[in-house]
């Protein structure tokens, strides 16, 4: 078995580092750089290149100034932060995982062990919390389209703040453990940080809930409320509104095409999050409650599932690129429709003005004839 990470936050490395097939040392076996680990490293490098390029492009696209906007829209701000979270996963989690599988043991020292485990979990938290913020923003945009969007920055600050605070225990749980023998071995583990097995299981379950279960429930609630609101009969009724309200609503009805694309993008991000990480977290749950499964499940399966989870970071910029292309087409169609509508209005106004001129001429000629008749009669 390779040395790598038992879970996305690496808290099960202690057991994995000393178990499995490898080099026998004093009656036990140490991990080796197996063929499965080599494939994992190769795929991780491909994911790193694609994720770094895609998310850097998204970050540049959403942060560059727009001529038509004084400041970035809330949607662009949200996806800028999501790209930053994906880049944190790209530049911390992926290189750490690849390097650790190559070196097998930990060679960077105790301080780097604690710091990198902290940054790794913070990256995972931010990548899980920011889709929740996007879901809350989409919910507010649909349920209260005329409301203020000033709360987006507070939600973003809360997401990053929670990511930092919840990852802090990693600084105290992880440390380096040295093993003497014919083949000296050092590993970055949580071994000895928990007095009992149930304490480590509780910490893992808490991290699992914060990383996966709670964000999933929050996003499911947000999008369920959106679907119920959009499909409700009151939302479909627009003809019974007063004229002024109808005109205001019509001005917003041109925007929902873009809002709908943003909603679809957010839903796709939720689906990719579920599809990419659910299998691996289920495997982690199985391991926490049945540690003996580590010797029953082939190492290649854990490698595949973890790589499938890392696929989430490269997919986000592809989804955003499709969203941006759709928005540009939508804006072009909207501008064409607006120009056609404006031309039609101008034509109607000209016809109405000509008709008024004809009516005025007719009235003037009639009044002139009546005046002439009266003057002749009087003579």
Swiss-Prot record:
Disulfide bonds join 113-188. Residues 61-76, 137-160, 225-278, 324-379 are cytoplasmic. It comes from the Eukaryota. PROSITE patterns: G_PROTEIN_RECEP_F1_2 (PS50262). GO terms for molecular function: G protein-coupled receptor activity; peptide binding; protein-hormone receptor activity. The chain crosses the membrane at residues 41-60, 77-96, 115-136, 161-178, 205-224, 279-297, 304-323. It is a multi-pass membrane protein. One of its GO terms (cellular component) is plasma membrane. Residues 1-40, 97-114, 179-204, 298-303 are extracellular. One of its GO terms (biological process) is cellular response to hormone stimulus. Its main location: membrane. Keywords: Cell membrane, Disulfide bond, G-protein coupled receptor, Glycoprotein, Membrane, Phosphoprotein, Receptor, Transducer, Transmembrane, Transmembrane helix. Glycans are attached at residue 101. Phosphorylated on the C-terminal cytoplasmic tail. It is found in: Cell membrane. Gene3D superfamilies: Rhodopsin 7-helix transmembrane proteins. Belongs to the G-protein coupled receptor 1 family. PANTHER family: GONADOTROPIN-RELEASING HORMONE II RECEPTOR-RELATED (PTHR24241:SF69), NEUROPEPTIDE RECEPTOR-RELATED G-PROTEIN COUPLED RECEPTOR (PTHR24241). Receptor for gonadotropin releasing hormone II (GnRH II). This receptor mediates its action by association with G proteins that activate a phosphatidylinositol-calcium second messenger system. This is Gonadotropin-releasing hormone II receptor. It comes from Chlorocebus aethiops (Green monkey). The gene is GNRHR2.
């Amino acid at each position: 078995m390779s040395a790598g990470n038992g879970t996305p936050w690496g808290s099960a490395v202690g057991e994995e580092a000393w178990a499995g097939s490898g080099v026998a040392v004093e009656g036990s076996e140490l991990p080796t750089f197996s063929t499965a680990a080599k494939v994992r490293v190769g795929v991780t490098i491909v994911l790193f290149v694609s994720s770094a390029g895609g998310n850097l492009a998204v970050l540049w696209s959403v942060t560059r100034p727009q001529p038509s906007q004084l400041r970035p829209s809330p949607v662009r701000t949200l996806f800028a932060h999501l790209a930053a979270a994906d880049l944190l996963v790209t530049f911390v989690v992926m290189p750490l995982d690849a390097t650790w599988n190559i070196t097998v043991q930990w060679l960077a020292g105790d301080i780097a062990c604690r710091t990198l485990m902290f940054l790794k979990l913070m990256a995972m938290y931010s990548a899980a919390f920011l889709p929740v913020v996007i879901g809350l923003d989409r919910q507010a945009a649909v349920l209260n389209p005329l409301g203020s969007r000033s709360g987006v920055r507070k939600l973003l600050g809360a997401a990053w703040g929670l990511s930092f605070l919840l990852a802090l225990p990693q600084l105290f749980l992880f440390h380096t453990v040295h093993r003497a023998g014919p083949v000296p071995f050092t590993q970055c583990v949580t071994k000895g940080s928990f007095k009992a097995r149930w304490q480590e299981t509780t910490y893992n379950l808490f991290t699992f809930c914060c990383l996966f279960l709670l964000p999933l429930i929050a996003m499911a609630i947000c999008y369920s409320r959106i679907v119920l609101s959009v499909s409700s009969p009151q939302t479909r009724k627009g003809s019974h509104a007063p004229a002024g309200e109808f005109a205001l609503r019509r001005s917003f009805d041109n925007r929902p095409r873009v809002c709908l694309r943003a909603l679809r993008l957010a839903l796709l991000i939720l689906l990719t999050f579920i599809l990419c990480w659910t299998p691996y977290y289920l495997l982690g749950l199985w391991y926490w409650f049945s540690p003996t499964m580590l010797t029953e499940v082939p190492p290649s399966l854990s490698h595949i599932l973890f790589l499938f989870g890392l696929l989430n970071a490269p997919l986000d910029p592809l989804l955003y690129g499709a969203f941006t292309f759709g928005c540009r087409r939508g804006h072009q169609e909207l501008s064409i429709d607006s120009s056609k509508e404006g031309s039609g209005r101008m034509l109607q106004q000209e016809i109405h003005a000509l008709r008024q001129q004809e009516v005025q001429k007719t009235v003037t000629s009639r009044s002139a004839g009546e005046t002439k008749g009266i003057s002749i009669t009087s003579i």
